[in-house]
């Protein structure tokens, strides 16, 4: 499953970066990071990652919770969405 985490830092960016590095180096089992991006606007960063289930994805958000507030979205590809539309 594909997930997108929208992140707001709770602490200074430098502290969040150091803590985030630690999290990304010690990921929960089965999680694969596809990309991490710092952003301008409402959110400070975005993580795109794969996890075997929502339960495993939640673990990453819990681990990050000390220094980051996350809003996690489940994502599917455009192609998958179009296939689903065809089944309606």
Label the model's feature ranges.
Residues 1-27, 39-43, 55, 76-88:
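Short S/T/G/P-rich N-terminal loop/turn motif that feeds into the first structured element of a domain
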Residues 5-7, 49, 72:
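Short beta-strand element of the conserved SAM-dependent methyltransferase core
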Residues 20-24, 48-50, 62, 66, ...:
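General N-terminal targeting signals
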Residues 27-28, 33:
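Alpha-helical interaction segments
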Residues 29, 41-45, 66-68:
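A generic structural signal for short beta-strands and their flanking turns/coil linkers
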Residues 31, 52-80:
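An amphipathic, aromatic/His-enriched active-site/gating alpha helix that lines ligand/cofactor pockets
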Residues 34-60:
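Short, intrinsically disordered low-complexity segments
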């Amino acid at each position: 499953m594909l997930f997108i985490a929208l992140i707001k830092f709770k602490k200074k960016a430098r502290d969040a970066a150091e803590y985030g590095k630690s999290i990304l180096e010690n990921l929960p089992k089965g999680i694969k990071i596809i990309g991490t991006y710092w952003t301008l606007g409402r959110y400070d960063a975005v993580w795109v990652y794969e996890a075997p289930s929502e339960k495993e994805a939640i673990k990453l958000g819990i681990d990050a919770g000390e220094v980051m507030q996350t809003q996690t979205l489940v994502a599917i590809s455009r192609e998958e969405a179009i296939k689903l539309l065809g089944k309606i």
